[in-house]
Amino acid sequence: MNYPLLMAQAIILFVPALIANSGAVLTGGYFVLDRGKNFIDGRRILGDGKTLSGYLGGSFIGIVSGVIIYWISYATHFILGNYGSIALSIEIPAVMAFGSLTGDILGSFVKRRIGIKSGGKGGLLDQWPFALVAFLFLFLMERPFFLHYYFFAGIIVILAIVPPLHRAVNIIGYKLHKKDVPW
């Protein structure tokens, strides 16, 4: 088995989960998910940064990226990896995109519970929950795909690249005035 190629494929095929997170920033801002309400601890449930438009828009952008990856893979005779079929090129990226943004929301929920306000630095709580929940969704809903591309080493590689990639994308978003803070 060609492990370097499999690692590259794992990264490329995970792009919908990564893109969805950035897409949420671009499409967000409308219909705050927690509607301004507080949890039983008196703190906001999620904060103003988690919106329905971001969740749906980011997921849509993630799905579109998956379809694009499928067609590029098809044109290159699947050297970049393969979702399996045209239908799966929509389904698998949808699972990853919705998983990614659900993980981002869960990370925000945990951050609020430990006293980190919306926009505050959360370290790995800002970076890993979206990837971990995308993996969980894949494992639960697309197990054959998950087991082929995301064995132990594939997960480790993704988790290793997420923090610097997340930081770089957030700095770009900050410079483009799409984010209030560069993290």
Curated annotation (Swiss-Prot):
Entry keyword annotation includes Magnesium: yes
Catalyses which reaction(s): 2,3-bis-O-(geranylgeranyl)-sn-glycerol 1-phosphate + CTP + H(+) = CDP-2,3-bis-O-(geranylgeranyl)-sn-glycerol + diphosphate
Subcellular location: Cell membrane
Broad class of enzyme this protein falls into: transferase
An example Gene Ontology biological process: glycerophospholipid biosynthetic process
Disulphide bond pairs: none
Highest taxon, organism lineage: Archaea
GO cellular component, one term: plasma membrane
Known function: Catalyzes the formation of CDP-2,3-bis-(O-geranylgeranyl)-sn-glycerol (CDP-archaeol) from 2,3-bis-(O-geranylgeranyl)-sn-glycerol 1-phosphate (DGGGP) and CTP. This reaction is the third ether-bond-formation step in the biosynthesis of archaeal membrane lipids.
Family indicated by similarity: Belongs to the CDP-archaeol synthase family.
Protein's recorded name: CDP-archaeol synthase
Organism: Thermoplasma volcanium (strain ATCC 51530 / DSM 4299 / JCM 9571 / NBRC 15438 / GSS1)
Phylogenetic classification of the source organism: Archaea, Methanobacteriati, Thermoplasmatota, Thermoplasmata, Thermoplasmatales
Gene: carS
